[in-house]
């Protein structure tokens, strides 16, 4: 006898745990150009990794509209990707990512149809990579330093708050060119 998965849909239209209902995937360019990419996506991968502090992913698409030209999409941290989704257990979630690279670009026909992959990550990852801290921290706990570093160097407007487990002992350390996340480790 085969176990059958329940087929009743919840309010989000998903059937099984692990199902994801993608709402919108909107490209926002620096010049104000916006486009919903949902209908031209071939594959979307969003990765959370226990060895990485930041979410990252790739979006492969077949572009019949010439978005690389009209956006333009440079992949140098100038464009944003807004992803909205639902799961069986959550209300709608909207995540903002920064596109840092365009790869695997290939022309599919003589017109403007192209296939390519957009590589993206969180805005905090870009800020972390761009900054080095040369500073001595004294008179606080490690959890207080983590909150301070997040607020001063990584926090983005509308971004998530940092959840930190309180620590007990007052300590000091010196950052000699570490990134903000290296200081928070």
Predicted segments, located by residue:
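Charged- and aromatic-enriched interaction segments used to assemble
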Residues: 110-185
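Assembly/oligomerization scaffold segments
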Residues: 1-127
């Amino acid at each position: 006898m085969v176990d059958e998965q329940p087929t009743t849909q919840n309010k989000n239209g998903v059937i099984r745990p692990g199902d994801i209902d993608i709402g919108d995937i909107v490209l926002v360019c620096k010049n104000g150009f916006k486009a919903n990419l949902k209908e031209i996506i071939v594959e979307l991968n969003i990765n959370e990794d226990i060895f990485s502090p930041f979410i990252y992913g790739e979006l492969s698409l077949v572009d019949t509209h010439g978005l690389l030209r009209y956006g333009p999409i440079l992949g140098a941290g100038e464009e944003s990707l807004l992803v909205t989704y639902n799961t069986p257990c959550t209300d709608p979630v909207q995540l903002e990512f920064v596109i840092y690279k365009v790869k695997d670009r290939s022309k599919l026909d003589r017109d403007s149809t192209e296939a390519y992959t957009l590589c993206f990550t969180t805005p905090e990852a870009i800020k972390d990579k761009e900054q080095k801290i040369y500073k001595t921290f004294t008179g606080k706990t490690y959890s207080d330093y983590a909150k301070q570093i997040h607020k001063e160097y990584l926090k983005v407007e509308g971004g998530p708050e940092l959840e930190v487990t309180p620590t007990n002992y007052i300590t000091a350390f010196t950052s000699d060119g570490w990134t903000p996340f290296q200081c928070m480790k």
